[in-house]
Amino acid sequence: MSKQILWKDSWQAIPRSFGRFIAISLLMLLGTFAFIGLKITGPDMRQTALDFFKQNNLADVTVTSTYGLDQTDQQTIKDQVGVRQVTFGYYQDAAINHSQTSIRVYSNTKQISKYQLVSGKRPTKANEIALSTSLQGKYKLGQTINLGHTTELKNQKFKVVGFVKSSEYVSRTDYGQTNVGTGQLSGIAVTTKNAFNATNYNIARVTYRATKRMNAYSDRYNEYTDDKKTQLQTALNKLRAPKYQNYQSQITTAQNQVTQLEQAASANPAFQTQLSQAQAQLTSTENNLKNLGYPSYTVSTRSSFPGYSVYRSNSRRVDVLANVFPVFLFIIAALVSLTTMMRFVKEERITIGTFSALGYSHRDISLKFILYSIMSSGIGVLLGAIGGFTILPQIVFKAYAASSTISGLQLHFSWTYLLIVIAVALCSTTLAALYALRKDYQEHPASLLLPKPPKAGSKILLERFTPLWRHLSFNYKVTFRNLFRYKSRALMTIFGVAGCVGLLVMGIGIRDSLSGIISKQYETIIKYDLIVAQKAAPIETESQSYQKLLNSDKVRRHQAIYTQQFNKIAGSDQSTQTITMIVPANQKHFNKFVNLLSPSGQELSLPKNGVILTQKMADLLKAKKGSQVSLKDANGQSHHFKVMGIAQMYMGHYLFMSRSAYEQSFKTNYQTNAQLVTLKHNSSKQVKKVAQSFIRTGAVTTTSLNLENQQLIANVINGLNTVIVVLIAIATILAMVVLYNLTNINVSERIRGLSTIKVLGFFDREVTMYIYRETIILTTLGILFGYLFGYGLHAFIMINLPPDNAMFDDSMYPLNFLISTIIPCLITLGLAFIMHRKIRDVDMLEALKSVD
């Protein structure tokens, strides 16, 4: 039998129902775009970073020491089991042209943690320097910069010959702290080893043989490097006491020389000059030794490199969103597509009967629906996959790239995600159509040539409430009858609208939660502008300058504190968390600097015994009031604390103690080592200026500016905001397509009924409202259920989205629900005008005779 007519009818079905065809394509496009795009972005970001690290042979571990690395230190590092390569180098912090721009100057390395040249050339002479790309806007190639007087560098003036990227500094905004300039590094620089004066190296970079075959973002790699870090730290700690004794013996020798010179000078005044020089040298050495304290070694894994963990966390935040938003979005799109295809089969009932009566096989008749479903869903999947694999990852990466040195996202293809999408598309369109056809094929061709008889009439639940039913108008009685008559379509409309509204509530809610973090953290909780860390033994003139600045009119108030950092392995990836302990000297006015609030918002005061731990750390440790927590200090010694309260803190981990609790816990006398400072004018320019003034007193080792912390938070928020805006846009478009599709199905199903009441004399507006009243009721129910759905999704995301060192504001604001209501309402209103025109232009007689 010739299939020409069958093929012709199959192809003509597309233009005959082009709106339905486009709707299915759009649904599949949106679902595929969001699903593939978000699922592939996280892996793309991580693989791009891994390739960057591999290309530059990023160190697995770095070692620095307050006393430098002598031959014994170097040999100890080389002798560690599993070491593949070790390189040693120098670094020195300096301020450019005596400005607020501080940089860390490194000696060039050609093996480990290589510097990637972006423009210009690498320095080859002792007076040449290459700056990090973060400084590219401030300085130009060929420009001469002055790094001031530093004992570690041979030259003060350097010629800028290039701009580089360092794989050890993934962040473009966070370079760490320093004791020059404002106390915050603005970038790094590279010069030759010959440019340094130092006798001992002060940084070692180490790679291990086993890590060459590991994924650097895997738990296996983290566990391995943490283990190697512990081994190396233990080995180096054994050298601390001998090194300190060696320096003490040098001081003793110098003291003996001074004593001898004093005796010589008393006999011969000619030795007086030598005596003065020796005394000055001795005093300087003693002060330096006191400020340096006991020798310490800092062994760091990649997780401690500036921006390394943040970048990984950013990519994993995308993974969290990818496991929620696109999955639900795709489910909604698939279910609506399923409903649409099943309705398409119902509309083609008579055509199916005609072809069946003409002798065409069920397989031949099914060809039309297979072709239609594959074409409509296939176009959507194809376009969505192209955009998902190429466009969406670039949009997300671009948002994060502004604060990262990693550039040039490497796009990857995934058969797994594509096959999942194809399977869902086929199930929701092709299989749905074949399932609906299966029922029709069970009927005789003669019965298929007649419309399917309606279900037997029955009372709806509302009719049993007689007093209420009597007071309803005819229009509302018809509306409620139809709602209960077409239950599956009504439920699908409610589900579709609820899903879209839920995604909007979640998306806008996340955006609100992110936007409120900075104000809550740095206006409600933390009220100081900077922390100033003091030297252990400043000379008298330095102390005087320092106290004078503290009491100047630039400072509104200040609070002496003792601060120390602890570590704890915790979190989803069992990474090292840093906890900052703050112990104020004066507890009475501490709330003017840090406002301690419980999770419920009640004010907390420092307990006489025990500590107050911030909320996120308490969650990671599953600690509550009365729990014992164990933390390690920089030397690996464990300390145990009893939690007496839990306080809000949105970024970072903190532990607060009273003075008496500190002395009781550490068995030592309390002594301050820093100041919390609140300025009268806290503009960005003023804060940096005052921070620089503190550094210049000579009594300060470093400063920590809240401005820098706010910038780090802003970078995270901006990246997530871009993702959320894209998701909100997709959810809005999905709502439009879903509502249009379901409303169109509703009108198509009821075209005979609409024609009937139109013939009976109903006005166009009444005819439209006859059917659109149902849409309004179903949309309203969908919006209400969407609130609950969105609230649950938002709560889930707020638990899983933040990194281990942060907590998001989980509040839901009325404006969120208002916007999430207005969007579907506007779409419904817009569709009302479209459907009104469609219903108005219906050929009533044609519609009424179409099934005869």
Please provide the spans of the model-predicted regions.
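Interfacial "coupling" helices/loops that link adjacent transmembrane helices in transporter permeases
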Residues: 9, 15-17, 335-374, 721, ...
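Peri-transmembrane interface segments
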Residues: 41, 48, 54, 107, ...
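N-terminal Sec/SRP start-transfer signal
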Residues: 1-33, 370, 458-499, 746, ...
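Alpha-helical transmembrane segments
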Residues: 19-22, 30-57, 392-398, 501-528, ...
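Hydrophobic secondary-structure segments that place a key small or acidic residue at a functional site
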Residues: 117-193, 202-203, 207-214, 602-660
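Small-residue-rich transmembrane alpha-helices
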Residues: 338-350, 374-406, 415-442, 743, ...
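The feature marks short, hydrophobic/small-residue-biased sequence motifs that occur predominantly
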Residues: 39-42, 79-125, 161-166, 563-603
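Juxtamembrane segments of multi-pass membrane proteins
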Residues: 474-608, 615-616
